[in-house]
């Protein structure tokens, strides 16, 4: 403890540093699309109902995406959310949603120039 600080002030500084470290760790590792599996970034343009949505993908195409059953109730998706989609091999105009980014994660990806210019709406 430094001589010019009281015990309470010293504890406050430690708490603030711990909160800062927790915020950094909460971003931790941001999941990126696996290009080998054909995954890509996309922005949700329109909710169509029945677990279907219209997604603007990084390759410039708008695809009809579906939310798989394992994600349906756990992860709520809204318009203008950043998602990872995987186009179907036999119908490339359709895709499955693999992951949804939070607003914090999306802005982090945008700030670090990890998003393609086509879908970077978080500038």
From Swiss-Prot:
Transmembrane segments: none
A GO term for molecular function: RNA binding
The keyword Amino-acid biosynthesis belongs to this UniProt entry's keyword annotation: no
Domain annotation S1-like: ranges: 28-102
Acidic residues: compositionally biased ranges: 1-11
Record keyword ATP-binding present: no
Keywords tagged on the record: Initiation factor, Protein biosynthesis
PROSITE patterns per the UniProt record, alphabetical: IF1A, S1_IF1_TYPE
SUPFAM superfamilies: Nucleic acid-binding proteins
Disordered, as annotated region: 1-26
Sequence similarity: Belongs to the eIF-1A family.
The protein's role, per its UniProt record: Seems to be required for maximal rate of protein biosynthesis. Enhances ribosome dissociation into subunits and stabilizes the binding of the initiator Met-tRNA(I) to 40 S ribosomal subunits.
Name of the molecule in the record: Translation initiation factor 1A
């Amino acid at each position: 403890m430094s001589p010019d600080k009281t015990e309470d002030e010293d504890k406050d500084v430690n708490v603030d540093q711990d909160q800062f470290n927790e915020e950094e760790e909460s971003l931790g590792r941001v999941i990126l699309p696996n290009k080998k599996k054909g995954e890509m970034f996309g922005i949700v343009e329109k909710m169509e109902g029945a677990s279907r949505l219209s997604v603007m993908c990084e390759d410039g195409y708008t695809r009809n995406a579906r939310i798989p059953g394992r994600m349906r109730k756990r992860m709520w998706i809204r318009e203008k959310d950043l998602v990872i989609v995987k186009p179907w091999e036999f119908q490339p105009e359709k895709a499955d949603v693999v992951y949804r980014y939070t607003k914090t994660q999306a802005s982090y990806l945008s700030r670090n120039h990890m998003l393609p210019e086509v879908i970077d709406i978080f500038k």
